[in-house]
Amino acid sequence: MIEADRLIAATGPREREEIQDRAIRPVSLADYIGQPSVREQMELFIQAARGRNESLDHTLIFGPPGLGKTTLANIIAEEMGVSIKSTSGPVLERPGDLAALLTNLEPHDVLFIDEIHRLSPIVEEVLYPAMEDFQLDIMIGEGPAARSIKLDLPPFTLVGATTRAGMLTNPLRDRFGIVQRLEFYSTADLATIVSRSAGILGLPLDPEGAFEVARRARGTPRIANRLLRRVRDFAEVRAKGHITKPIADLALNLLDVDERGFDHQDRRLLLTMIEKFDGGPVGVDSLAAAISEERHTIEDVLEPYLIQQGYIMRTPRGRVVTRHAYLHFGLNIPSRMGDMPVVDEFLDAVDD
């Protein structure tokens, strides 16, 4: 399975969707909906940095895909009144790639590195003195004639984004003065986002229709906006373009997105655990083989939302479905589950 092929994928949009996404992205903290703690803190930090005429401290933003890490990075640059240069960890293959970006920054500019956990060790080593001392150490020549020279860099702000904060090395993580975690959005916040996007795109949308789209969007703005575009297609063809709750419900059912925001892949994972592994515990490798998926697809794509919603637990012995999964499919809850610990006790447990 390719994550980008899922309608409810939280990965980046396709090229055509990306153009529309840029039009509906907020460009200031005042327009930024949700994440109240992050918004309040960043407003404070930015105001303080501007008052001192300094660069904002290096900032790490982490959380599940589609929650607005790139959007927040662009807002930081906009609020600071500086330019932003964007790249990603896999693109920076050699130290020279990073050096070219750093030497072209203006004072107080923002350098945004997405997927920063995928930086190669050799590039990461070059980044340390740049972050700490605003200096670039580069090697000139080869062999015995090689020598190191230092280049002074203008003060800048590195904004790193990652979905896998645990994969960052300690030296890199410790160099970020500001660390922000983005959480899944509430349905109310997503409904506000959907209504705002519909207004920008000129779509007639009832509040109840916005809420219906929002509650199936898995707590993720990117998914909410993608579902809105598909519901718009349905409404334009079959409902004269007006999106109401019944129209949104019909459209999303047609698109195989159920009331919990699950699609076919989510339901297949849960049913496989119930029917083939008696609800678990089951190891992730066995589960991957059973549904013909890669291990990382289960860990990075399918599991996070199911765990966050309490449908799957990670235990030291493997994955286990909860009673919520049985209830979702209208199945009888096994009697043995009456003795199971409360779901919340396991939500943060990690297995192999």
Curated annotation (Swiss-Prot):
Which is a Pfam family this sequence falls into? Answer: RuvB_N
GO MF terms, alphabetically ordered: ATP binding; ATP hydrolysis activity; four-way junction DNA binding; four-way junction helicase activity
Enzyme superclass (EC): hydrolase
UniProt-listed SMART domains: AAA
GO BP term, example = DNA recombination
Role summary:
The RuvA-RuvB-RuvC complex processes Holliday junction (HJ) DNA during genetic recombination and DNA repair, while the RuvA-RuvB complex plays an important role in the rescue of blocked DNA replication forks via replication fork reversal (RFR). RuvA specifically binds to HJ cruciform DNA, conferring on it an open structure. The RuvB hexamer acts as an ATP-dependent pump, pulling dsDNA into and through the RuvAB complex. RuvB forms 2 homohexamers on either side of HJ DNA bound by 1 or 2 RuvA tetramers; 4 subunits per hexamer contact DNA at a time.
* Protein name according to UniProt: Holliday junction branch migration complex subunit RuvB
Please tell me the species this chain comes from. Pseudomonas fluorescens (strain ATCC BAA-477 / NRRL B-23932 / Pf-5)
